[in-house]
Amino acid sequence: MTELQKLEAGLEYCFFDEEVAQRKTNAVIKCKQLNAIAPDDFKEQSRAIKDLLGSVKGEAYINAGFYCDCGKNIHIGRDFVANFNVTILDIAPVHIGDYCMIGPNTLITTVGHPLRASGRRKHLAQAKPINIGDDVWIGGNCVILPGVNIGNNVVIAAGAVVTKDVPDNTLVAGIPAKKIRELEE
């Protein structure tokens, strides 16, 4: 089994593998191009976003400072907004629903590393997909960890670290993020 096959099967894989690294190199180049586009050139931004990401359902606005691992594993819905300095480490798929907003300096990461030092010395990682529903607002300086599913109509308060699934119609905050209250539909 190749390292790429291990990655896609959700198993531990070596992140220095050539095939895995090549995906990242392509994304780094495309992110650099996207971030260099003039902020008022919406047509060119739209073209670059659609070239970088796996799928874009409708309009998407991504501010400068956007970075991702692969790009093609990110699938976004209608009217997507990412503020400044958003990073999505999409070694595994990231699905983001319609009408979602991501605040500045936020990290969405599908990849983690072993707790065992011996595994980290071998450059091992494991990727788990992330799913984000419709009408989600992720505040600034948040972290969404691997394998998390976020429901519809959810607000993630600024600075939260989301380690577990979040049900529909919920406001969460804190480190780790905990339910504060239910939201009206």
Regions from the language model: what does each represent?
Residues L4-Q5, L52, K122, P129, ...:
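Short secondary-structure boundary/capping segments
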Residues M1-E59, A177-I180:
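Terminal amphipathic alpha-helical/low-complexity segments used for targeting or macromolecular assembly
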Residues G159:
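Rossmann-like dinucleotide/phosphate-binding beta-alpha-beta segment
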Residues P39, F66-I76, V81-I150, T170, ...:
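Flexible, glycine/small-residue-enriched loop-and-beta-strand segment within the central core
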Residues N149, T163-K164:
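Active-site/ligand-binding-proximal alpha/beta "capping" segment
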